[in-house]
């Protein structure tokens, strides 16, 4: 992608500076919509602040632990026995020094933190839940100071924290099984070693020593040492912090995401563990494809609109999965000057999903690419509420392709493409 091209050219950034304000088709309508939306928001939270403002995304640690979906030791387990040391309240009470919000945001989900433990000292933003999972429980590390320091390094060097933590977790399992040794790494690499995490993160950013291998990402790292099955990836991208053996819909979302495993292209956690708009059994796979498709469609609309997913996704799902609440349609109409029906917005979402799928098909991807590691589909999760379960991906794919009106091999049908004007 573009990132690869920029990296090859050693291009660090592209800066665009405009001299004009963006035009709004109907400024008065936009103000009315904004007043209404913010009024609803203030009314909803008149007695209690938004949970994301209080604890940020780290709230998810306790929820994931309770549902047995907190990835631990490179997805060998779904619960972490030292989870309380990395939960939101621990972060808040020991490291958080303030909140951070995007411009004019009423939520303020960001965390400003400061680490005083000498060997990990520093200050900055984060960590978010996905960082805490990937560098914490997934590496069996319960030292939040170490996790936060590694997070700072990633922020400064432009590294993705999910990929970084997951790749270290993969390396730790390779080391545990004897597939790599101290000779390759340069020092012992064992579960729970926060100092090793920080050291390897810096080595990766600087492309030094074993860091060069880690910079390959977990798939190519595991492949290099002869065990690609230990890379917890889909389409070679590392997972977000939910074990799909105990959260079936998330497994389908991971496998069918056009960019590889991602919770940002459709997040079934809303109805599988958060109970929005209703709590579905996370262990049930039958009928789950319909809900996953709805989440993916909503995410596509939110991405295309440029509105924050935290502010809109929850609101959209709370309103029975319709694309009308909290003014998303009204915002679009006020800014663009176009009128949108719910049906038109739904078709825009489907057009985005199918156009992306067509790109993948033409690049040679198909059903065989919509996959998960053997561990998640064949090795039952050993702990938590989902103990004994695997992810029923193949069965869900059959349902999903029918919902999308794609072929059994995952190719958009001519009928569907004609319906969307993509022929």
Task: Tell where the protein language model's regions lie, with residue ranges.
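Extended C-terminal regions of large enzymes
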Residues: 1-423
